[in-house]
Swiss-Prot record:
Catalytic activity: 2 Fe(II)-[cytochrome c] + H2O2 + 2 H(+) = 2 Fe(III)-[cytochrome c] + 2 H2O
Task performed by this protein: Destroys radicals which are normally produced within the cells and which are toxic to biological systems.
Similarity comment: family membership: Belongs to the peroxidase family. Cytochrome c peroxidase subfamily.
Originating species: Gibberella zeae (strain ATCC MYA-4620 / CBS 123657 / FGSC 9075 / NRRL 31084 / PH-1) (Wheat head blight fungus)
Pfam family membership, one: peroxidase
Alphabetical list of SUPFAM superfamilies matching this protein: Heme-dependent peroxidases
Location of the transit peptide in the chain: 1-36
Record's cofactor remark: Binds 1 heme b (iron(II)-protoporphyrin IX) group per subunit.
One of the GO BP terms on file: cellular response to oxidative stress
Location (main, coarse): mitochondrion
The protein's name: Cytochrome c peroxidase, mitochondrial
Upper taxonomic lineage: Eukaryota, Fungi, Dikarya, Ascomycota, Pezizomycotina
Length: 358
């Protein structure tokens, strides 16, 4: 049922993406929350031992050895675009099959995993970023900003086991790319080449945005990663997806009426709706005056209060194509932060075909 409802919502969004009007929608059902353990250790195989090898022009080489007496020669497997497309398709198939999560989709939490894995980058020290997948370990997995992301890591563990040659780092980012595209967002070019690190690579707490803060905080956090005002606003458009949970961030509710479809509705709602403080026992957040079913965070409202942020909000509210173009460009940059890609691969990114275009 959730899958059928999600498909209907996506079809309706395709037809009305340029004809948005703020009005009460069908009530979004809030699924029962599930609790997840961190992903299990990767199973070893009696037949193969996989080792990450040297980086090559299109990604990484993976060496494996047979354990039979007649197989003494190491072989190298260099995954191609087609191999990564198979991983993409597997993630997309699981997104369609596993519809027992928020609003019928794990898509938003996969985007959040990729975002939080990348958003720890510090341009001054060169630490953090999407290389390493260090959120597999405490203390990074226990950072408050990462609460609830075990759900995304557990969702991807069977994919990792089916394709053991892909690193967790590359898998998490590919999952973010897949989720954005499968939720009708823009194409996000992808470049493999990330390696996994151990617990020593965990980043310090406090590098991700704090939803309770406003414009100065946003500029400090995003500026550390190298983003300007326009890029901060474009990246914030990811809040069109998903919802907040009281047992994670403390906040509650979705930002938009279609939290499993990426559109510019987040910006339209910011500009066109009236927002008021929510009267409840939780942390300070806003609710829409019309239906009281949507929410905005203090960091969201900061985008329309700041005179330099607001023009970009207004631009994206009027032009979904402009938002998609800028969002794709800045997400590509975000997902590559901190990755020591092999020289000569700058223009060797791949774009994968979404399943809804097949």
């Amino acid at each position: 049922m959730a899958s059928a409802t999600r498909q209907f919502a996506r079809a309706a969004t395709r037809a009305t993406r340029n004809g948005f009007a703020i009005a009460p929608r069908q009530v979004i059902r809030q699924q029962g929350r599930r609790y997840y353990s961190s992903e299990p250790a990767q199973k070893s195989s009696s037949a193969w031992i996989w080792l990450t090898g040297a980086a090559v022009a299109g990604g990484a080489g993976y060496y494996f050895y047979g354990n039979s007496a007649s197989s003494a020669t190491a072989k190298v497997f260099n995954p191609s675009k087609e191999d990564y497309q198979k991983v993409y398709n597997e993630i997309a198939a699981r997104l369609e099959e596993k519809d027992d999560y928020d609003d019928g989709s794990y898509g938003p939490v996969l985007v959040r995993l990729a975002w939080h894995a990348s958003g720890t980058y510090d341009k001054e020290t060169g630490t953090g970023g999407s290389n390493g997948a260090t959120m597999r370990f405490a203390p990074e997995s226990d950072h408050g900003a990462n609460a609830g992301l075990a759900a995304a890591r557990d969702f991807l563990q069977p994919v990792k086991e089916k394709f053991p040659w892909i690193t967790y780092s590359d898998l998490w980012i590919l999952a973010g790319v897949c989720a954005i595209q499968e939720m009708l967002g823009p194409a996000i070019p992808y470049r493999p080449g990330r390696s996994d690190r151990d617990v020593s690579g965990c980043t310090p707490d406090g590098r991700l945005p704090d939803a309770s803060k406003r414009q100065d905080h946003l500029r400090g956090i995003f500026g550390r990663m190298g983003f300007n005002d326009q890029e901060i606003v474009a990246l914030s458009g990811a809040h069109a997806l998903g919802r907040c949970h009281t047992d994670r961030s403390g906040y509650s509710g979705p930002w938009t009426f279609s939290p499993t479809v990426l559109t510019n509705d987040y910006f339209r709602l910011l500009v066109e709706e009236k927002w008021q403080w929510k009267k409840w026992n939780g942390p300070a957040q806003y609710e829409d005056k019309s239906t009281k079913s949507l929410m905005m965070l203090p960091s969201d409202i900061a985008l329309i209060e700041d005179k330099k942020f607001k023009p970009w909000v207004e631009k994206y509210a009027k032009d979904n194509d402009a938002f998609f173009k800028d969002f794709s460009n800045v997400v590509l940059r975000l997902f590559e932060l901190g990755v020591p890609f092999a020289q000569g691969t700058e223009n060797q990114r791949w774009t994968f075909k979404p399943t809804h275009q097949e």
